Structures are given as C-alpha cells and as structure tokens.
Amino acid sequence: MNILPISAFFLLYLGHSLAQENVCNLPVDEGVCRALFKRFYYEPATDSCKEFYYGGCEGNGNRFKSKKECILKCQKNKQLIKTRKRKPKKTTKPPIPIISLD
C-alpha cells in the first residue's frame, strides 16, 4: 500500500485547517483600493469583532460581511450574539363596536 497519497492529503487538510484558524489572528487590513465597504474584523486582544471599511481589493482573511459571521468564526465567547426578538403579529382585528338602540 502506498502511503504517500494519504500523507499528502493529510498534510493538505492540516495546512488548510490551520490557515482557516489563523485568519482570526491576522491584523485588520483595509486593502489598497479606495472603496468603502463596511466590514468586520476580529480583534484577539479584546475577543471582539469591530467595524472597519474595506477598500475592495487585497487585504486578508480577517474580514467578514457581518458582525455575526465574525463572531461565529472567531470569537471565543459566542454568547455575546444578540438575537432580535420579533414582536408577535396581530392576527385578529379589533372588535367592531355594536350599537344597540333598545
């Protein structure tokens, strides 16, 4: 049995996994272009996701379209995700007043 293909696959998988984990430790990078896309980056020192403006090209992987995406990917204390509570929909119409002429 040739173990080389299995070893190569394992090393590629391991490298990919480590690269995925390390994006959270990269510094914020606005990129070199001048667009203003609102994005979020993870700041390890405060274990929080913060807003910044991305220029639209280059930069690094520590860039998320939403704060929730950043939190789910990087933040250690994930309980800080706030869920919006929906107000219950009114499904009944208000009662129609009945006038009695007795």
From Swiss-Prot:
SMART domains xref list: KU
Tissue specificity statement from the Swiss-Prot or TrEMBL entry: Salivary gland (at protein level). Not detected in female carcass without head and salivary glands. Not detected in males.
Comp. bias (Basic residues): 83-92
PROSITE patterns the UniProt entry points to: BPTI_KUNITZ_1 (PS00280), BPTI_KUNITZ_2 (PS50279)
Gene3D superfamilies hit by this protein: Pancreatic trypsin inhibitor Kunitz domain (4.10.410.10)
GO molecular function: serine-type endopeptidase inhibitor activity
Ranges for domain BPTI/Kunitz inhibitor: 24-74
Cellular component, GO, one term: extracellular space
Localization in the cell: Secreted
Keywords assigned by UniProt, alphabetized: Disulfide bond, Protease inhibitor, Secreted, Serine protease inhibitor, Signal
Record's subunit section: Interacts with mouse, bovine and human coagulation factor X (F10) (activated). Interacts with host elastase.
Summary of the function given for this chain in its UniProt record: Salivary anticoagulant that inhibits plasma clotting in the host. Strongly inhibits host elastase, coagulation factors Xa (F10) and cathepsin G (CTSG). Inhibits host plasmin (PLG), kallikrein, trypsin, beta-tryptase and coagulation factor XIa (F11).
Protein name: Simukunin
Source species taxonomy: Eukaryota, Metazoa, Ecdysozoa, Arthropoda, Hexapoda
